[in-house]
């Protein structure tokens, strides 16, 4: 999920027009042999040039999410980010593809993305950007970001060819999805927990449980939670309830600012408690969401 509205919406939609490139790539792909396809998609990091951009980014993103890192070896931050993403890609074993664009070597590819600074990371699915961020991110946050990409695109792409994975949706997963869609949060939580118990690496189950737990809590809050919290400015529980309702109503920035203001007014265990809840709310969203980025920055300012 990330929001009660669709998660990982096209954060860069309209910023990069890849439709023409995608059309040409599909035409080229139709003329390629299976052997050529295998040779052009090695495991690990794929170095992108003008020559392979269409195949390895646009066409490949019809199969699995493609994370494009635009970087320069002259920057230590870029090198660190490449190392972290490379490790995540290796661990994913083909569930997503990491494409590396050295902007010093392939400046015209960088221009396609309108890069203003490096490192810049853009995730694509079905030939279109779906999320992006600039700068170095903590490893745990990058891992959650990748998880959110996989969750948001689950069942929507062709998938990489694999003898280990079936194209059919697991009946247990289908049931859990339907329960969540029907608003039966308790049943969906139980179903997803069973999936996670059987498969501890399930990206979808982890994300769904986190989201469902929020929805169960938020929908149980009193309707006037915001006005109550406004009248009790230092009541932590009231602030938590109000923030839940605000997030549920998609007034996300206001929810974040409410708790950040409380961080500024508290100390010790109380401050830790508020900070922990705020981070939990951040984790409901795409880490590259502008409201999350601003919220994390404001929280850091409030703490330090």
Swiss-Prot record:
Record-annotated membrane-spanning stretches: none
PROSITE patterns given in the database record: THIOREDOXIN_2 (PS51352)
GO cellular component, one term: peptidoglycan-based cell wall
InterPro entries the record matches: Thioredoxin-like_sf (IPR036249), Thioredoxin_domain (IPR013766), TPR-like_helical_dom_sf (IPR011990)
Pfam family, one: TPR_20
Signal is among the record's keywords: yes
Signal sequence, start to end: 1-15
Keyword Signal: yes
MF terms in GO: oxidoreductase activity
GO biological-process terms attached to the record: cell redox homeostasis; response to stress
Species for this entry: Mycobacterium tuberculosis (strain ATCC 25618 / H37Rv)
Record domain Thioredoxin: where: 28-151
Keywords tagged on the record: Signal
Name of protein: Uncharacterized protein Rv1324
């Amino acid at each position: 999920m990330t929001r009660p509205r669709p998660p990982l919406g096209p954060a860069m939609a309209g910023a990069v027009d890849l439709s023409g490139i995608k059309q040409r790539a599909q035409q080229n792909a139709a003329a390629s042999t299976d052997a050529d396809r295998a040779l052009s998609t090695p495991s690990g990091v794929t170095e992108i040039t003008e020559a392979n951009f269409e195949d390895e980014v646009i066409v490949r993103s019809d199969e699995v999410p493609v994370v494009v890192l635009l970087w320069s070896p002259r920057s230590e931050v870029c090198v660190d980010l490449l190392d972290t993403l490379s490790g995540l890609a290796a661990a994913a074993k083909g569930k997503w593809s990491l494409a590396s664009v050295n902007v010093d070597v392939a400046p015209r590819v960088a221009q396609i993305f309108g890069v203003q600074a490096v490192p810049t990371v853009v995730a694509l699915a079905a030939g279109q950007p779906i999320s992006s961020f600039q700068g170095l991110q903590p490893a745990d946050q990058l891992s959650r970001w990748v998880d959110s990409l996989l969750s948001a695109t689950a069942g929507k792409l062709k998938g990489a060819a694999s003898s280990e994975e079936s194209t059919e949706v697991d009946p247990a997963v289908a049931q859990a999805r339907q329960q969540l869609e029907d608003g039966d949060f308790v049943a969906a939580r139980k179903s997803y927990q069973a999936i996670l118990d059987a498969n501890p690496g399930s990206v979808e189950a982890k994300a769904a449980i986190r989201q469902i737990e929020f929805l169960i809590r938020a929908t149980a809050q009193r309707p006037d939670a915001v006005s109550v919290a406004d009248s009790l400015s230092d009541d932590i529980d009231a602030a938590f309830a109000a923030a839940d309702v605000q997030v549920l109503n998609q007034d996300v920035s206001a929810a974040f600012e409410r708790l950040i203001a409380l961080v500024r007014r508290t100390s010790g265990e109380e401050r830790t408690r508020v900070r922990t809840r705020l981070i939990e709310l951040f984790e409901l969203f795409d880490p590259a969401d502008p409201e999350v980025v601003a919220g994390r920055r404001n929280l850091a300012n409030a703490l330090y």
